[in-house]
Amino acid sequence: MASKLLRAVILGPPGSGKGTVCERIAQNFGLQHLSSGHLLRENLKTNTEVGDVAKQYLEKGLLVPDHVITRLMMSELETRSAQHWLLDGFPRTLVQAEALDRICDVDLVISLNIPFETLKDRLSRRWIHPSSGRVYNLDFNPPQVLGVDDITGEPLVQQEDDKPEALAARLRRYKDAAKPVIELYKSRGVLHQFSGTETNRIWPYVYTLFSNKITPIQSKEAY
């Protein structure tokens, strides 16, 4: 088994269960889970230079452009150069993937393919704690008190773009941007696609895939 540092990426539309899969990979294999959404929230909260630039776009209801997200992630990855890591939410576009290429070779890419109806159902049951980014699902990860964050006691919200009428457009945007990224990694032989409606069914295959690349830190598979 290679002793080099593992560089992994997870791709998937909103509601695909990326966060859950990432947590399990981090727990079982000791990879640093680096979420672009989480890092963006941290930078917005602490008013960093890149956070202030991103805020200008978000306040106008615009997507944060590639060059801002890329700068945010490159800065974080520089500090993680001695660690195994797993990227979540980056790269989302071909421009971002090409920027990542300039600093490292990606060893492993997972793409989660979930049927639209499943995504719609999941997201209609999804509630967020805005300041931390904690995600709850009323079916399989409900808060202890309905509508309230477990840790802070602050109210949970449902994002506008999780609502069914916004989801189709959001999914189309994801697919359009992700298609060339998926093709790029497929052409390099590092892409592994998983289809299904249940994270627990996909997980054993993901676990086996990572076990072939890196020694688990748990003697037993953790769920």
From Swiss-Prot:
Record's keyword terms, sorted: Acetylation, ATP-binding, GTP-binding, Kinase, Mitochondrion, Nucleotide-binding, Transferase
Reactions catalysed, as given in the entry: a ribonucleoside 5'-phosphate + ATP = a ribonucleoside 5'-diphosphate + ADP; AMP + ATP = 2 ADP; GTP + AMP = GDP + ADP; CMP + ATP = CDP + ADP
Region span, LID: 125-162
CC annotations in GO: cytoplasm; mitochondrial matrix; mitochondrion
One GO term of the biological process aspect: nucleoside triphosphate biosynthetic process
Binding site for a ribonucleoside 5'-triphosphate: G15, S16, G17, K18, G19, T20, R126, V135, Y136, T199
SUPFAM superfamilies given in the database record: P-loop containing nucleoside triphosphate hydrolases (SSF52540)
Sites bearing N6-acetyllysine, chain numbering: K175, K179, K186
Organ and tissue specificity: Expressed in the pyramidal cells in the hippocampus.
Subcellular localization, as worded in the UniProt entry: Mitochondrion matrix
N6-succinyllysine modified-residue sites: K60, K179, K186
Pfam families named in the record: ADK (PF00406), ADK_lid (PF05191)
Region (NMP): 35-64
Binding site for AMP: S36, R41, L62, L63, V64, G89, F90, P91, R92, Q96, R170
EC number: 2.7.4.4, 2.7.4.6
GO MF entries: adenylate kinase activity; ATP binding; CMP kinase activity; dCMP kinase activity; deoxyadenylate kinase activity; GTP binding; nucleoside diphosphate kinase activity; nucleoside triphosphate adenylate kinase activity
The record's note on its domains: Consists of three domains, a large central CORE domain and two small peripheral domains, NMPbind and LID, which undergo movements during catalysis. The LID domain closes over the site of phosphoryl transfer upon GTP/ATP binding. Assembling and dissambling the active center during each catalytic cycle provides an effective means to prevent GTP/ATP hydrolysis.
Subunit structure: Monomer. Interacts with SLC25A5/ANT2.
Summary of the function given for this chain in its UniProt record: Broad-specificity mitochondrial nucleoside phosphate kinase involved in cellular nucleotide homeostasis by catalyzing nucleoside-phosphate interconversions. Similar to other adenylate kinases, preferentially catalyzes the phosphorylation of the nucleoside monophosphate AMP with ATP as phosphate donor to produce ADP. Phosphorylates only AMP when using GTP as phosphate donor. In vitro, can also catalyze the phosphorylation of CMP, dAMP and dCMP and use GTP as an alternate phosphate donor.
Family the UniProt entry places it in: Belongs to the adenylate kinase family. AK3 subfamily.
Protein name, per record: Adenylate kinase 4, mitochondrial
